[in-house]
From Swiss-Prot:
Tissue-level expression: Detected in testis (at protein level). Testis, myometrium and fallopian tube. Also expressed in the brain with highest expression in the cerebellum, optic nerve and olfactory tract. Isoform 1 is detected in brain, spleen, pancreas, liver, kidney and placenta; isoform 2 is not detectable in these tissues.
Gene (name only): GLI1
Disease tied to this protein: Polydactyly, postaxial, A8: A form of postaxial polydactyly, a condition characterized by the occurrence of supernumerary digits in the upper and/or lower extremities. In postaxial polydactyly type A, the extra digit is well-formed and articulates with the fifth or a sixth metacarpal/metatarsal. PAPA8 is an autosomal recessive condition characterized by the presence of postaxial extra digits (hexadactyly) on the hands and/or the feet. Polydactyly, preaxial 1: A form of polydactyly, a condition defined by the occurrence of supernumerary digits in the upper and/or lower extremities. Preaxial or radial polydactyly refers to the presence of extra digits on the radial side of the hand. PPD1 is an autosomal recessive form characterized by duplication of the distal phalanx of the thumb.
Recorded GO CC terms: axoneme; ciliary basal body; ciliary base; ciliary tip; cytoplasm; cytosol; GLI-SUFU complex; nucleoplasm
Organism: Homo sapiens (Human)
Gene3D superfamilies, alphabetized: Classic Zinc Finger
Name this polypeptide is given: Zinc finger protein GLI1
Length: 1106
């Protein structure tokens, strides 16, 4: 096939034909005289395409003289250069563009091109381009090529060469060339064809196919033609009572007008025999006169354009027709957004009805016909073609009744009608029926077939995407044939509509929360035990709690709604995947995610935190309870962030002093409150401030609490502990635990030991006895994967009181810092007492790895403190004061009372905000000393209390040797607790579940084993919730040597500094709660003093109760 893009070299053409100048080179117009030699025209040159004005026409001045097939013509036919629209640049002329740009430009182009005298005015003659003609339209070209298209007249050739010599580059077949005379004859025939369709109009001439009937002229003529009476030539008068015969039509017309019409001036009624008006009078005489033309066939109004033989019975029709020559389209579509213009109002109405409305008011009322059309012209056409020329359509045919079901064949009807109709009908539109069906364009299909598929008429809406083509209003529909679904027009309009539609759809389909963050929402789904942030979260609705980006990532609930990662998809990238987060936030998120995932002690490894004891931890505190609370508050979580804990992000910090996480255990959770899964690594040690891991843990716990019945600390009777951050439900939450705590009031020091249910929230602050399934036992060295649940050794101050698993006790064994679970019984408290995470949250040592985490909802269980940081691994695991049996009702009550008291004191201390000052000392002694022995020597109490509390300090220093290494977290927690106590002083101490037994009497000056009360544990900062080591089962009181395990508050105060993370992390401010003031140690000292003063009594009470 000829490559239109490659212009044939001039020389190549010279052989068969005379050399032709390039399109830029003007060629003298070819006249008959200009041609010499045998006049042969290559038909392909004459018509590259039957419907295009293309070079074929340009090159074809066959009527003027024969031209050999010229490659130029072929090239011009195929290639369109980006030349100006100048009428002279035929090769590059884009008819549609020209028409759209200026209807007149096309006319000018045609006029300039049409130099042949062969008969067309301003355009090729009717027959020249008409596809309806039996011969190719290109042969009808009569114009000599204009200079721009000029084809040099073929020079004299040898006849041998002059014959059709297919040019090697010529594209298309080389039919036998027609002599000029033959062409002239054909052209004459074409002109003689009674094509009332405006084939004579440039729009209709052969352009129809390229334009797909988009030119207005065609439709106008079609309409006119329909309106025009049949080409009748009547010479006999059929007026009632008159039978005169005349020699000519003119005589008959004169007779009628003078004798019948003017003779009956009072009544304007047609008495012509068989008139469809049935004697219905007209309103005016001129109307009757015009009507009579229908009977006589008179068409006095003739087109004045050269070569146009059109004539009309009505002047208005002639005017409309003339617009086809001039390109004028004064009638604009009134539909909003539709830019189509028409040369006559009827065409516009037709377009509007077809494309912008499904209504088909024009019904064929002939018997047995149910066809309906959108416009009268289509109806007339239908009647004329289907029912015959004698069946006249009148206004009576317009149906007002309900639209009958449009027969599906209606779409096919146009074609059939065209086929059955006169040649002019066919000549009008040669567009395939298929192309026309979808489009209601009257021009494309027979106008009568407005029944084009309903989609055609309705679908062609500007707003809708019309695959069919020029939807109504499409700019492509250049011609009045608005319906004419020009293929090109269709493509353009369709493309436009598609583009618009795509845009709309894109806006509508825009995915929510496509931040690209892969972190799964950390939110916990109610009581679901799973804390993991990963896929389990996907099941959860994305909310601040469920959203991985939400509170867990310190992102507001709003952001959680747009969680970048699917709720169920684990945030593989962790917080780091959140591009918008600050490093601290990323770290926090990672820690939380890690703890939630149980991935490890590191923030990222804490992912296992989400499932403690192999079971997903339900949030310990309901989000509802702590709407403003965000376990990650200490972390960079915004106050607007959901209060829910970041799903089991590893509470890398030691339990917070006031964190009831160790104590708070959903009473209803049988090991489900929070999974103290030894495998859930708590990012206890995580470099991020304990607040992050702690908060994460607390968030996770809070989430777990939430689903659990009675999970809320309040529900569990831990209301007094409500102030304690639930995130540290394990008691190691970390300074941020306060943030995690429902009560933002907690300062960093008020971190719950575990991410377990907020000590203040959910069921018991202390782990509920046997409420949680036994988490996988973990060695103290190994922190449960649910590190988020249990502060790592670092979080616990590096020491985790090793308490027998809560499973052993049937209840969570609460380490002192962890505080006793407020749950069912002292056993629940025992974990709190026993669970004394070491101060260093960095070590995600499963605090309760040894405990059946699930057995009680131990907030202090290893879930929060999955693995104490190695640095803070308890130098010596302190036996947690596990309440082996729920029978310690009295002792537990006492312990609980003491814990409550201690918690209150710790709250005071926390409120003092000196927790951060507490050195990260003695994370080793996680035993109740921290909690029970929360009595810190005033000097120590005065020592800066680490706001993060033991095990919560972002940097849990190794436990100070001065204090029990393991309890140091306790001390720290205590100090933190003191800060929190002070902080919580404002908030009444949570009522921890009665500690089964408080560790020995608290010694003010010495390191008294902190009460199993989670508050104490939190205050102590030690892993109050840490369960005793797997094998260790001890009564919290028994296992706790209260005398020996005296809290060295000075050491605690000193130690929390290293252990406690910055108060900012722990503060609830981010969670919307007032973070416990993380003031200097001296602040905590005041609280500590109060605590110390109260501790002796508490200790004695505990001892007596023990």
């Amino acid at each position: 096939m000829f490559n239109s893009m490659t212009p044939p070299p001039i020389s190549s053409y010279g052989e068969p034909c005379c050399l032709r100048p390039l399109p830029s080179q003007g060629a003298p117009s070819v006249g008959t005289e200009g041609l010499s030699g045998p006049p042969f025209c290559h038909q392909a040159n004459l018509m590259s395409g039957p419907h295009s004005y293309g070079p074929a026409r340009e090159t074809n001045s066959c009527t003027e003289g024969p031209l050999f097939s010229s490659p130029r013509s072929a090239v011009k036919l195929t290639k369109k250069r980006a030349l100006s629209i100048s009428p002279l640049s035929d090769a590059s002329l884009d008819l549609q563009t020209v028409i759209r740009t200026s209807p007149s430009s096309l006319v000018a182009f045609i006029n300039s091109r049409c130099t042949s005298p062969g008969g067309s005015y301003g355009h090729l003659s009717i027959g020249t381009m008409s596809p309806s003609l039996g011969f190719p339209a290109q042969m009808n070209h009569q114009k000599g090529p204009s200079p721009s298209f000029g084809v040099q007249p073929c020079g004299p050739h040898d006849s041998a060469r002059g014959g059709m010599i297919p040019h090697p580059q010529s594209r298309g077949p080389f039919p036998t060339c027609q002599l000029k005379s033959e062409l002239d004859m054909l052209v004459g025939k074409c002109r003689e064809e009674p094509l009332e369709g405006d084939m004579s109009s440039p729009n209709s001439t052969g352009i129809q196919d390229p334009l797909l009937g988009m030119l207005d002229g065609r439709e106008d003529l079609e309409r006119e033609e329909k309106r025009e009476p049949e080409s009748v030539y009547e010479t006999d008068c059929r007026w009632d009572g008159c039978s005169q015969e005349f020699d000519s039509q003119e005589q008959l017309v004169h007779h009628i007008n003078s004798e019948h019409i003017h003779g009956e001036r009072k009544e304007f009624v047609c008495h012509w025999g068989g008139c469809s008006r049935e004697l219905r009078p007209f309103k005016a005489q001129y109307m009757l006169v015009v009507h009579m033309r229908r009977h006589t066939g008179e068409k006095p109004h003739k087109c004045t354009f050269e070569g146009c033989r059109k004539s009309y019975s009505r002047l208005e029709n002639l005017k409309t027709h003339l617009r086809s020559h001039t390109g004028e389209k004064p009638y604009m579509c009134e539909h909003e957004g539709c830019s189509k213009a028409f040369s006559n109002a009827s065409d516009r109405a037709k377009h509007q009805n077809r494309t912008h409305s499904n209504e088909k008011p024009y019904v064929c009322k002939l018997p047995g016909c149910t066809k309906r059309y959108t416009d009268p012209s289509s109806l007339r056409k239908h009647v004329k073609t289907v029912h015959g020329p004698d069946a006249h359509v009148t206004k009576r045919h317009r149906g007002d009744g309900p639209l009958p079901r449009a027969p599906s064949i209606s779409t096919v009807e146009p074609k059939r009608e065209r086929e059955g109709g006169p040649i002019r009908e066919e000549s009008r539109l040669t567009v395939p029926e298929g192309a026309m069906k979808p489009q209601p364009s009257p021009g494309a299909q027979s106008s009568c077939s407005s029944d084009h598929s309903p989609a055609g008429s309705a679908a062609n809406t500007d707003s809708g995407v019309e695959m069919t083509g020029n939807a109504g209003g499409s700019t492509e529909d250049l011609s009045s044939l608005d319906e004419g679904p020009c293929i090109a027009g269709t493509g353009l309009s369709t493309l436009r509509r598609l583009e618009n539609l795509r845009l709309d759809q894109l806006h509508q389909l825009r995915p929510i929360g496509t931040r690209g963050l892969k972190l799964p929402s950390l939110s916990h789904t109610g009581t679901t035990v799973s804390r993991r942030v990963g896929p389990p979260v996907s099941l959860e609705r994305r909310s601040s709690s469920s959203s991985s980006i939400s509170s867990a990532y310190t992102v507001s609930r709003r952001s959680s709604l747009a969680s970048p990662f699917p709720p169920g998809s684990p945030p593989e990238n962790g917080a780091s995947s959140l591009p918008g987060l600050m490093p601290a936030q990323h770290y926090l998120l990672r820690a939380r995610y890690a703890s939630a995932r149980g991935g490890g002690t590191s923030p990222t490894a804490a992912s296992s935190l989400d499932r403690i004891g192999g079971l997903p931890m339900p949030p310990w505190r309901s989000r509802a309870e702590y709407p403003g609370y965000n376990p990650n508050a200490g972390v960079t979580r915004r106050a607007s962030d959901p209060a829910q804990a970041a799903d089991r992000p590893a509470p890398a910090r030691v339990q917070r002093f006031k964190s009831l996480g160790c104590v708070h255990t959903p009473p209803t959770v049988a090991g489900g409150g929070q999974n103290f899964d030894p495998y859930l690594p708590t990012s206890v040690y995580s470099p991020q401030p304990p607040s992050i891991t702690e908060n994460a843990a607390m968030d996770a716990r809070g989430l777990q609490e939430e689903p659990e019945v009675g999970t809320s600390m309040v529900g569990s009777g831990l209301n007094p502990y409500m102030d304690f951050p639930p995130t540290d439900t394990l008691g190691y939450g970390g300074p941020e635990g306060a943030a995690a705590e429902p009560y933002g009031a907690r300062g960093p020091g008020s971190l719950p030991l575990g991410p377990g249910p907020p000590t203040n929230y959910g069921p018991n602050p202390c782990p509920q006895q046997a409420s949680y399934p036994d988490p996988t036992q973990e060695t103290w060295g190994e922190f449960p994967s649910h590190s988020g649940l249990y502060p790592g050794p670092k979080a616990l101050g590096g020491t985790y009181s090793q308490c027998p698993r809560l499973e052993h006790y049937g209840q969570v064994q609460v380490k002192p810092e962890q505080g006793c679970p407020v749950g069912s019984d002292s056993t629940g408290l025992a974990p709190c007492l026993n669970a004394h995470p070491s101060e260093g949250p960095p070590h995600p040592q499963p605090l309760f790895s040894h405990y059946p985490q699930p057995s009680p909802p131990q907030y202090l269980q290893s879930g929060p403190y999955t693995q104490p940081p190695p640095d803070y691994l308890p130098s010596e695991p302190r036996p947690c004061l596990d309440f082996d049996s729920p029978t310690h009702s009295t002792g537990q009550l006492k312990a609980q009372l003491v814990c409550n008291y201690v918690q209150s004191q710790q709250e005071l201390l926390w409120e003092g905000g000196g927790r951060e000052d507490a050195p990260a000392q003695e994370p080793s002694y996680q035993s109740p000393k921290f909690l029970g022995g929360s009595q810190v020597s005033p000097s120590r109490a005065k020592a800066p209390v680490n706001t993060y509390g033991p095990g919560f300090g972002p940097n849990l220093p190794n436990h100070k040797s001065g204090s029990y290494p393991t309890p140091s977290p306790c001390h720290e927690n205590f100090v933190v607790g003191a800060n929190r106590a002070s902080h919580r002083a404002a908030a009444p101490p949570r009522l921890l579940p009665p500690l089964p037994t408080c560790y020995g009497p608290l010694k003010v000056g010495g390191t008294n084993p902190s009460c199993g009360h989670p508050e104490v544990g939190r205050l102590g900062g030690g892993p109050a919730l840490y369960p005793p080591p797997e094998g260790q089962v001890c009564n919290p009181l028994d296992s706790l040597d209260l005398d020996n395990t005296q809290l060295d508050f000075v050491a605690i105060l000193d130690e929390p500094q290293g252990l406690s993370p910055p108060p900012s992390h722990d503060q609830r401010g981010s969670s919307g709660h007032t973070p416990p003031p993380s003031g200097p140690p001296n602040m905590a000292v005041g609280n500590m003093s109060v605590l110390l003063r109260s501790l002796p009594g508490e200790t004695e009470f505990l001892n007596s109760s023990a």
